[in-house]
């Protein structure tokens, strides 16, 4: 399945299981491509530490043009959370480093230990995914991978500060065999959500 297709499929299934329309073009004023004390509040020191641990260039970060970030989907109503589908490239050594620096007691809708374990297993392959791509604030080989891990933190740290419920994350390893919207796929996702949303 092509990159992005599985994400669309999972979004559709989650929407069906929750009986809630997925908003795939949702924007938030506070969900932009650089960190600030104003947006991160009590988690500012954590995101700043994470940024530094990834060897980010703070001057480049703070002077780059502010751009609204996309989330894979947003589910409103009683759910009020961002949904993210994590493919292999999200399980890098950079992502492992970010999770290790998360504040204690952070509420998330996924198993941090499992994400760390998967990052340990897949980091070599994930680190090599588009390895030569750089960004303005991560201007080195592997920079885009570091930026991806940095921005994943926004999806985990900001909701608590900005009045949303914790981000729902599902990874590709949890949904092996899900290839279409059918009764079996809906049941599998329903069982997964029972674990994640309790």
Regions found by a protein language model. Give the residues of each.
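Nucleic-acid endo/exonuclease domains
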Residues: 1-198
């Amino acid at each position: 399945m092509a990159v992005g297709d599985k994400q669309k499929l999972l979004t559709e299934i989650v929407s069906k299981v929750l009986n809630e329309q997925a908003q795939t073009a949702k924007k938030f004023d506070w969900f932009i491509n650089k960190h600030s004390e104003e947006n991160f509040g009590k988690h500012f020191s954590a995101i700043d530490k994470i940024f530094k641990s990834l060897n980010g260039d703070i001057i480049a970060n703070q002077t780059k043009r502010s751009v609204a970030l996309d989330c894979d989907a947003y589910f409103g109503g009683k759910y009020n959370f961002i949904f993210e589908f994590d493919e292999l490239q999200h399980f890098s050594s950079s992502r492992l480093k970010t999770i290790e620096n998360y504040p204690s007691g952070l509420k998330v809708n996924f198993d941090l230990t499992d994400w760390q374990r998967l990052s340990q297993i897949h980091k070599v392959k994930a680190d090599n995914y588009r390895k030569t791509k750089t960004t303005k604030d991560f201007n080195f080989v592997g920079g885009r991978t570091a930026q991806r891990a940095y921005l994943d933190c926004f999806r985990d740290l900001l909701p608590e500060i900005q009045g949303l419920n914790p981000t729902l994350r599902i990874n590709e390893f949890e949904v092996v065999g899900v290839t279409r919207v059918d009764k079996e796929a809906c049941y599998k996702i329903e069982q997964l959500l029972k674990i994640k949303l309790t």
